[in-house]
Amino acid sequence: MPTINQLVRHGRKVIKEKSKSPALQGHPQKRGVCVRVSTMTPKKPNSALRKIARVRLSNGIEVTAYIPGIGHNLQEHSVVLVRGGRVKDLPGIRYKIIRGALDAAGVENRKQSRSKYGAKRPKK
């Protein structure tokens, strides 16, 4: 326990909170170019081939981002918008690609949660 005098001299040190998406450098989203598009297997109890892309952001940092939704049109040199947000069963993946923005098309035949997947309203 510090004395009053020690607190007057030095004060309390503020603990800075660590960013969960440091590559975005405080921005909500960043534009990037796909360097590699591939699949990855999730951690133990789950089994699948999750779609991922290695993206070089506009600030020069290269990150691995998850491609959400069923099916995608991304390939090398596609320009994408990346946001923060991890995928719980893929270690080391802390970013997601925004569907329906730039070169990433929205998910086809999506009826619910359309705004999260860039899907247009279906015709009646």
Swiss-Prot record:
Q: Which residues carry this modification: 3-methylthioaspartic acid?
A: 89
What keyword terms does UniProt attach to this protein? Methylation, Ribonucleoprotein, Ribosomal protein, RNA-binding, rRNA-binding, tRNA-binding
GO MF annotations in UniProt: rRNA binding; structural constituent of ribosome; tRNA binding
Source domain of life is Bacteria
PROSITE patterns referenced in this protein's UniProt entry, alphabetically: RIBOSOMAL_S12
Looking up Pfam families in the UniProt record yields: Ribosom_S12_S23
Chain's role: With S4 and S5 plays an important role in translational accuracy. Interacts with and stabilizes bases of the 16S rRNA that are involved in tRNA selection in the A site and with the mRNA backbone. Located at the interface of the 30S and 50S subunits, it traverses the body of the 30S subunit contacting proteins on the other side and probably holding the rRNA structure together. The combined cluster of proteins S8, S12 and S17 appears to hold together the shoulder and platform of the 30S subunit.
The family line of this record is:
Belongs to the universal ribosomal protein uS12 family.
How is the subunit organization of this protein annotated in UniProt? Part of the 30S ribosomal subunit. Contacts proteins S8 and S17. May interact with IF1 in the 30S initiation complex.
Protein name (record): Small ribosomal subunit protein uS12
Gene encoding this polypeptide?
Answer: rpsL
